[in-house]
């Protein structure tokens, strides 16, 4: 019987983070999911650890790949759940009820995005998805893939661009939401905890470069990006989101 969710973990030589992620996934109160791990041929004991947990893992592979999005696409081809969520090594669900709370809201849209705790070396912040997606938001910000549920069939039909190193998930959403009118819905619950030592967070210059390349490919040039005036509703939502973000930072939550 088809599962509701495919939880996917991609890993390469991050045994410490992998243990944290697997522990979080296996502690979930929700049971209607499959667990897939794609390891890039690690040499730090990751493969052996995955093998020790194989009775709890539906599918896994450890072999050389061509980058994170190649590994993610490999997992997508294996996935049989209705929705995919990528909880890559090091990141984890917020609580043991996170998947159960989010799954209640998965009901037909192409993308569902929940709230994310972002942790750096000094403090924690809460990242909130917009209640109403706008081009302004996706132009200027990102969606945390650790808290994003994407319809599996959409991912199979339109896999991630493996030529991009760190923004392919963002580009996937931009193209499918803006041009193909795929549906989006915010989930008002904290789904995941994300640590800022990931490649996309620590490579600001590459992120800007790749985003510019995506804009040029989709719109012809960055000068042709839509100039959309911020609505009163968007402004109110942005102010509320910014306030909540700053409050959490001030409280170090």
Language model features with spans:
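N-proximal low-complexity "stem/linker" segments adjacent to membrane-targeting elements
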Residues: 1-27
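Cell-envelope/extracellular polymer assembly enzymes that use nucleotide-activated donors
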Residues: 3-6, 34, 171
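Acidic helix N-cap motif at the loop->helix transition within catalytic regions
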Residues: 16-19, 44-52
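Glycine-rich, basic loop-to-helix element that forms the pyrophosphate-binding segment
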Residues: 21, 46, 62-79
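A conserved acidic beta->alpha catalytic loop
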Residues: 31, 39-48, 88, 92
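Short aromatic/hydrophobic "clamp" motif used to bind/position activated sugar donors
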Residues: 84
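Conserved donor NDP-sugar-binding/catalytic core segment of glycosyltransferases
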Residues: 92, 96-126
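Conserved nucleotide-sugar donor-binding catalytic segment
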Residues: 126-214
